[in-house]
Each structure stands twice: as C-alpha cells, then as structure tokens.
C-alpha cells in the first residue's frame, strides 16, 4: 500500500477528526485499533483498497459500510469523507497523527531508555514516577541495552534527552580536566 507521509493536509484531517470526536475519543481510538487489526492480521486489503486510486468510489463506500457496525458512526462518516475526497492513501497517516493528538490531549508519553543492562520493573516504575510531573502519564517504556554507557541511563522523551550515564559523566570530567590543564599551563607562561 502506498502511504502518504506527513504534511499539512494530513494534520488538518487529523485535527478535524479530533475536534469532531473530543467527547468520545475512546470510541474513536477503539475503531482505529479495529481498523489497524484488520491490517495487522495479514489482511491489509482494507486500507490498501481505500488507498487504491483505480478502485471505484461506490465499491469503496460499500467496503466502508461493511465495518460500520464495528466502529463509531463519527469515524465511519469521517472515513467516507476522506475517501470521497480522494485522500484514502492518507488514512494511515491521518490515524497516526490523530492518535498523537489524543496522547497529547491525555498527557501520555512514550519514552526510550538506554541503559547498560536491562531495567527491572521497579527501575522502570521509578523512572515513570520521576517523569510524571514534567511529562504526564508514561504509556510505554522502550528499554535498549548498550553496555558502552558503563552505568546509569539515557532517557529520550520526544526531543528531550536526559543523559545520566557514567560514560557521559566521564566525558564531562575529561573535558573539565583538559580545561584545567590548559588554564594551569597558560597561567605559568
């Protein structure tokens, strides 16, 4: 399936869906997950068919009507509008952008933690609790093991990076010692 990537149009559609469904976000999210599950079970023909520019619009509408009993009316009508406007190839990106808006609305974040060994459940919970006030609810933690950081961890939340690794600390000490040596050499000259 050809997927449209990003852009103004996608975010406009995603924002429109968000605004239309702000009172029933859970129902819309369940519907989107239902559609994603159609795709993930080896049968991605639903979104592929809606994205196909050569498929007949009446056939696309018929296919959308097949799932209307499984998704919210607002979502099915939204999909009809998108497909009628020949934007079916954008649906996947629209849904992903919409889900980002929902996560921001609910103050939910996903974080990535790089550590020298696998984090325990207790360590993950401690990190979540520490980040709760600044970032909101942590929905998922991805733990990557990198022995080269020697100890501590590096947390990535969106564009923010919190580096409390031993390797980073040692590099800082090395830079400080170079500066100290230079200043000592310069002061003796």
UniProtKB/Swiss-Prot annotation:
Main location group: membrane
GO molecular function: proton-transporting ATP synthase activity, rotational mechanism
Subcellular location: Cell inner membrane
Domain of life according to the entry: Bacteria
InterPro entries referenced in this protein's UniProt entry, alphabetically: ATP_synth_OSCP/delta_N_sf, ATPase_OSCP/d_CS, ATPase_OSCP/dsu
Membrane topology qualifier: Peripheral membrane protein
Gene Ontology cellular-component annotations: plasma membrane; proton-transporting ATP synthase complex
Annotated Gene3D superfamilies: N-terminal domain of the delta subunit of the F1F0-ATP synthase
Keywords for the protein's UniProt record, in alphabetical order: ATP synthesis, Cell inner membrane, Cell membrane, CF(1), Hydrogen ion transport, Ion transport, Membrane, Transport
Pfam families (UniProt xref): OSCP (PF00213)
Subunit structure: F-type ATPases have 2 components, F(1) - the catalytic core - and F(0) - the membrane proton channel. F(1) has five subunits: alpha(3), beta(3), gamma(1), delta(1), epsilon(1). F(0) has three main subunits: a(1), b(2) and c(10-14). The alpha and beta chains form an alternating ring which encloses part of the gamma chain. F(1) is attached to F(0) by a central stalk formed by the gamma and epsilon chains, while a peripheral stalk is formed by the delta and b chains.
Protein function: F(1)F(0) ATP synthase produces ATP from ADP in the presence of a proton or sodium gradient. F-type ATPases consist of two structural domains, F(1) containing the extramembraneous catalytic core and F(0) containing the membrane proton channel, linked together by a central stalk and a peripheral stalk. During catalysis, ATP synthesis in the catalytic domain of F(1) is coupled via a rotary mechanism of the central stalk subunits to proton translocation. This protein is part of the stalk that links CF(0) to CF(1). It either transmits conformational changes from CF(0) to CF(1) or is implicated in proton conduction.
HAMAP family: ATP_synth_delta_bact
Family: Belongs to the ATPase delta chain family.
Name of the molecule in the record: ATP synthase subunit delta
